[in-house]
């Protein structure tokens, strides 16, 4: 089965070489690497050209103008011709057997999700990182509240056929990222599997698109739980309308997915309830 890797870049020259090295060193070689740049100005494009010259299966593309994360990734994904597609960020490091493990584990599912462990560079030693070692689940109800990062996923190209044809005009397209959309679709169809293996080292630094400072108050503990309950009660009338809108967007997207799974129907009922602005 052919595996395509899709990597989208934007001013990632500092760490891009390390990521590409981990890709070309995979124990199971990819059929192709689709690398699409979104208007970098720091030498990223030259690095892509250099690797494409050394490895003919790396195909490089440059957007004529900056398109943003979702437009960049979805247009790059459409270029992939493999049966399976793996998403790569520009600044992580893959475990050498990532493709081999995940391609063996996906089975008949539409998506396989692995785990990532955070790390930081020496110059970023003041950054706080936290690794949650608990094994999450990836059913559709959980995926309405949390998501799986794209760099940990391998999915069948078939998954794209379940997305609405007018995806770009759906509210969710401007409210969240591509990996949330893909993960929720696979989970709604109940064809997603999680493997409890670390497949990616995720680099954390302040320049990363997904970086946010880790808040120690969010570590699960009795004291923090009580603190969050108190916060929710105090600011309920401010928070509830925002959360209702948040869940209404997810409910609207969920209803476009052609699924008859019972858990999918339960998720829609839950999202409709969460979308109400009153208790």
At which residue positions do the language-model features occur?
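Nucleotide-sugar donor-binding/catalytic module of glycosyltransferases
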Residues: 1-215
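Low-complexity, intrinsically disordered short peptide segments enriched in small/polar/basic residues
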Residues: 12, 20, 55, 103, ...
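Generic low-polarity alpha-helical segments
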Residues: 40, 225-228, 279
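Extended hydrophobic/aromatic-rich secondary-structure runs
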Residues: 150-156, 256-261, 279
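Catalytic core of nucleotide-sugar-dependent glycosyltransferases
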Residues: 202-206, 211-264
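C-terminal functional modules
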Residues: 272-279
């Amino acid at each position: 089965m052919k595996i395509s890797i899709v990597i989208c870049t934007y001013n990632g020259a500092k760490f891009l070489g390390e990521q590409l090295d981990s890709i070309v060193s995979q124990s199971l070689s990819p059929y192709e690497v689709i690398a699409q740049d979104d208007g970098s100005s720091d030498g990223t494009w030259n690095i892509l050209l250099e690797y494409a010259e050394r490895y003919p299966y790396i195909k490089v593309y440059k957007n004529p103008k900056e398109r943003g994360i979702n437009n960049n990734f979805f247009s790059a994904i459409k270029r992939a011709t493999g049966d399976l597609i793996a998403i790569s960020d520009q600044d992580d490091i893959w475990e050498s057997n990532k493709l081999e493990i995940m391609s063996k584990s996906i089975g008949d599912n539409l998506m396989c999700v692995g785990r990532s462990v955070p790390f930081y560079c020496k110059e970023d030693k003041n950054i706080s990182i936290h690794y949650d070692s608990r094994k999450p689940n990836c059913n559709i109800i959980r995926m309405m509240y949390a998501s799986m990062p794209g760099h940990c996923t391998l999915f069948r190209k078939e998954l794209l056929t379940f997305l609405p044809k007018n995806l770009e005009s759906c509210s969710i397209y401007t409210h969240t990222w591509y990996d949330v959309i893909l993960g929720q679709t696979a989970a709604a169809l109940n064809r997603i599997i999680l493997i409890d293996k670390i497949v990616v080292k995720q680099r954390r630094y302040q320049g990363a698109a997904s970086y946010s400072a880790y808040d120690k108050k969010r570590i699960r503990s009795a004291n923090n739980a009580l603190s969050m309950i108190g916060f929710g009660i105090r600011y309920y009338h401010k928070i509830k309308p925002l959360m209702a809108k948040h869940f209404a967007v997810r409910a609207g997207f969920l209803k476009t997915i052609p699924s008859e799974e019972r858990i999918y129907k339960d998720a829609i009922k839950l999202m409709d309830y969460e979308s109400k602005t009153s208790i």
